[in-house]
Amino acid sequence: MESTLGSDLARLVRVWRALIDQRLKPLELTQTHWVTLYNIHRLPPEQSQIQLAKAIGIEQPSLVRTLDQLEDKGLITRHTCANDRRAKRIKLTDGAEPVIREVADVISLTRCEILDGISADEVSLLANLIERLEQNIIHLQNK
């Protein structure tokens, strides 16, 4: 019998993300917005769009739409780099900080609810297995 592990993991990611989107809807944000805000917040100040896309692991054109939405919401600003007019630097606005804290609380609570009934050891084991799978895949890609 063929393993459905890949499909099972993909389904888990989809339903997890859908739950996060549902929980963030009252804040008019999505999981994609959160991942972007979180990475802008944790990286050194005024990263370029290229650096941010690499940190998130997506292509720059995919990032631009999300940044447009975050800028429209007043959570970030973008300005042209002085030494490279093609590049844009991203900065969180003062209004972003309380939103980031509120979203972090929603994400943390949701994560706790998702992991309810699963021991810390089980979570650690799962994380280690996922890491090993990822390393195996990276190794195979580099062959």
Curated annotation (Swiss-Prot):
Question: Which cysteines are disulphide-bonded?
Answer: none
Q: Which SMART domains match?
A: HTH_MARR
UniProt keyword annotations, A-Z: Activator, DNA-binding, Repressor, Transcription, Transcription regulation
Q: Does the keyword Transcription regulation apply?
A: yes
| Keyword check for 4Fe-4S | no
One GO molecular function term of this record is: DNA-binding transcription factor activity
Q: Which residues bind DNA?
A: 49-72
Its family? Belongs to the SlyA family.
User: Protein name, please?
Assistant: Transcriptional regulator SlyA
What organism does this protein naturally occur in? Edwardsiella ictaluri (strain 93-146)
Q: Which gene encodes it?
A: slyA
